[in-house]
Amino acid sequence: MHLTHLSLVDFRSYPSLDLTLGPGVVTLVGRNGQGKTNLIEAIGYVATLASHRVSADAPLVRQGASHAVVRARIVRGDRAALVELEIVPGRANRARLNRAPVPRPRDVLGLLCTVLFAPEDLALVKGDPAGRRQFLDELLVARTPRMAAVLADYDRVLKQRSTLLRTAGAARRAGGKGDLRTLDVWDGYLASYGAELLTARLALVEALRPGVAGAYAAVAGAQAAVGFEYRASVPQPAPDPVRPDRERWEEAIRAELVAARPREIERGQTLVGPHRDDLLLTVDGLPARGYASHGESWSLALALRLASFELLRADDREPVLLLDDVFAELDVQRRSRLAELVAPAEQVLVTAAVEADVPAELTGTRYVVAAGEVLRAS
């Protein structure tokens, strides 16, 4: 899989851009603030319908413009697809596939598959659980695009249920009882969607575990006992060879929701479910978040991305690799090892502030990015 063309209209700093791309290594070099990361962000948006830098879409639209457009031509084997996304702040975004409208933007998910390496990746190790949950969920959708609907349904139910809890809590504090007649219904939805999401995450962690350990050794250049464990907010149900895992987890979530209801009403929050889960990362038995050195943390963050890359390749979904200013964060040894590991990919896009940050192992087409223009280097 690779991109052959990227077109932008009023996306971030670009009034307009048409960029022809090819397989292999593509390097984008330019000083900070010239628009390199905006290109990576646009490509990632086509793959995930989200930015890795901001949570809302409004900042993606160039100041003064009413909307932004991102077009990408994707080649996979002997097939090509043209994806167009229109980003409209305050309104529903629109999508086209091969110039024909599709009912929902998420219908184009899966056409482009990417793995992004970025300076923000250090937060996968050192940051809050939300970043690690997002890492798992984005990979779930990349492998199984229908999981986007499960995530959307879970988020919708979570918001509705939490609103009901806040309303009930306010009523009780005012001396009333609060209307909880529909809470049982929302509990059922939350447990059902939550169990599907949780079991999918558990299966993903098991699939990733061997790759993370191997990638860590390859990047760090040293062996270490790397731990990779999913921590659910719900006690693990007892093993049952007859009942499916999803059914047992759904029952466990329901039971915890019942037990937590008084606290949830008091706090106005849903305290049970996969939105409260975490991924515990350890190095030599110690939590990486608190004990890993800077180098160990970077090796582990890169290992998560490399393991994702290999897992998608094993699924016959060769991803486009996006490396956004990541080499500047690494020492010389890790730069060289990472370059050797990603070089065989079908397409690799690398950004760097200076040419010296790009390892010699990554040779290919080079562009210079300056003041919103992207010019091929001679």
From Swiss-Prot:
GO terms for cellular component: cytoplasm. The keyword ATP-binding applies. It is found in: Cytoplasm. One of its GO terms (molecular function) is ATP binding. It comes from the Bacteria. Pfam families: SMC_N. GO terms for biological process: DNA replication; DNA synthesis involved in DNA repair; double-strand break repair; SOS response. ATP binds at residues 30-37. InterPro entries: DNA-binding_RecF, DNA-binding_RecF_CS, P-loop_NTPase, RecF/RecN/SMC_N, RecF_2. Its main location: cytoplasm. The keyword ATP-binding applies. Keywords: ATP-binding, Cytoplasm, DNA damage, DNA repair, DNA replication, DNA-binding, Nucleotide-binding, SOS response. The RecF protein is involved in DNA metabolism; it is required for DNA replication and normal SOS inducibility. RecF binds preferentially to single-stranded, linear DNA. It also seems to bind ATP. Belongs to the RecF family. This is DNA replication and repair protein RecF. It comes from Frankia alni (strain DSM 45986 / CECT 9034 / ACN14a). The gene is recF.
